[in-house]
From Swiss-Prot:
One of its GO terms (molecular function) is D-amino-acid dehydrogenase activity. The keyword Oxidoreductase applies. Its cofactor is FAD. HAMAP family: DadA (MF_01202). InterPro entries: DadA, FAD-dep_OxRdtase, FAD/NAD-bd_sf. This is D-amino acid dehydrogenase. It comes from Burkholderia pseudomallei (strain 1106a).
């Protein structure tokens, strides 16, 4: 089958790789000059299945009000003037219950754990290198309330059989020796030894090269204008003056997926703006070993070979990609507070990206009401964590195979309701 994939981020490239492995003829189209040059370019660098959790959580609405008045708040909201933003935020609020949080986190962990298994198999088969580390991830708490609040996450981890370690403040240095100097600031931590880290952009670039060896064709610097429809199916992709045709089409354009498919299916994928800095390491003994997640500021600090990546925060501001110095200040504050002297933040590069977020945190992977149109989008802050599993799952669905994990609750159909013959997001 001839397949066109729109988008060459980590999710699009992973989709291409697994579809090509399944024997399909794949073409990837993207407006950028190469793979992973947008949202996948400088993310936090973590592969964290156990920490897969929706931003929509109990207590978040009240926290959001408090964060409005804090200098280093992890969440900021600015109205963009669209009805879609208001609808999206309302649906996110409806997912901030204990019951829905557990449901959403459970299926996110299911996909993320499967994806990590797929990545490990890929690494064993291809020996792909991307400055990866397998030292686990450590979530650190600054208050007793945060430590006590980890109980709801631990319950989900137990149910999913995910290994974990609950550490006291004195025990944190066993996982991250450099934290010994600041352990008095922390109340404890939750460590997931099975998590991994690495450079997502490097991984995606090298996976694209492996995909090319399987016959995948990449068309970069190509504008994607519209999907052409005929007879109730996709007839092609309008790229400037050219119509690119195939048997099936996969939209993996992250936050830009929503507008492209709007006339065909309404998907609640909204851009969640995040930031990162990447600093050179100046003292390895004072730098992290793997990834450390600061629960207070919702910031991840990740060790690469000779660099530290610090990423996080969330702004609900539409497609605004302006770099804000105050956000850089927050990232620098966090890494210098936990790992003083580890990296040279004065020489750090500063970046922002738009994560494609659904209101319930779970991505949209699979079929749509349009017979030959498939989606692989909405992974939020977990694009790399879920990329290999999402790509393999999609390849199975498109090849007529039964996926290894449950997939029905990952498709767009969980959002659709029939109203006057139209498919609309189910906001009720």
């Amino acid at each position: 089958m001839r397949v066109v994939i729109l988008g060459s981020g980590v999710v699009g490239v992973a989709s291409a790789y697994y579809l090509a492995r399944a024997g399909h003829e794949v073409t990837v189209i993207d407006r950028e000059a190469g793979p992973a040059l947008d949202t996948s370019f400088a993310n936090a660098g973590q592969i964290s299945p156990g920490y897969a959790a929706p931003w929509a959580a109990p207590g978040v609405p009240l926290k959001a009000v408090k964060w409005m008045f804090e200098k280093h708040a992890p969440l900021a909201i600015r109205l963009d003037g669209t009805r879609f933003q208001l609808q999206w935020m309302w649906q996110m609020l409806r997912n901030c219950t204990t019951e829905r949080y557990a449901l959403n986190k459970g299926r996110m962990v299911r996909l993320a754990e499967y994806s990590r298994d797929c990545l490990q198999a890929l690494r064993a088969e291809t020996a792909i290198q991307y400055e990866g580390r397998t030292g686990g991830t450590l979530q650190v708490f600054r208050t007793q309330q945060q430590l006590d609040g980890a109980a709801k996450d631990i319950a989900v981890l137990r149910e999913a059989n995910v290994p974990f370690e609950l550490l006291s403040s004195d025990e944190l240095k066993k996982a991250e020796p450099a934290l010994a100097a600041v352990s008095h600031k922390l109340t404890g931590g939750l460590r997931l030894p099975g998590d991994e880290t690495g450079d997502c952009q490097l991984f995606t670039t090298r996976l694209a090269a492996l995909a090319e060896q399987l016959g995948v064709k990449f068309r970069f610097n190509t504008r994607i204008d519209a999907l052409a429809v005929a007879g109730g199916k996709i007839a092609g992709v309008q790229c400037g003056g050219e119509m690119v045709r195939a048997d099936a089409y996969v939209v993996a354009l992250g936050s830009y997926s929503t507008n492209l498919v709007a006339s065909l299916v309404k998907i609640p994928v909204y851009p969640l703006k995040g930031y990162s800095i990447t600093a050179p390491i100046v003292d390895a003994a004072k730098a992290p070993v793997s990834t450390v997640l600061d629960e207070t500021y919702k910031i991840a600090i990740t060790r690469f070979d000779d660099r530290i990546r610090v990423g996080g925060m969330a702004e609900i501001v539409g497609f605004d990609k302006r770099l804000r110095d105050a956000r850089r200040g927050t990232l620098e504050m966090c890494v210098n507070d936990l790992f003083p002297g580890g990296g040279d933040t004065a020489k750090a590069t500063f970046w922002t990206g738009l994560r494609p977020m659904t209101p319930d945190g779970t991505p949209i992977v699979g079929r749509t009401p349009v017979p030959n149109l498939f989606l692989n989008t909405g992974h939020g802050t977990l694009g790399w964590t879920m990329s290999c599993g999402s790509g393999q799952l999609l390849a199975d669905l498109m090849s007529g195979k039964k996926p290894v994990i449950r997939a029905d609750d990952l498709s767009v159909h969980r959002y659709l309701s029939e109203t006057d013959g139209e498919h609309r997001p189910a906001y009720a």
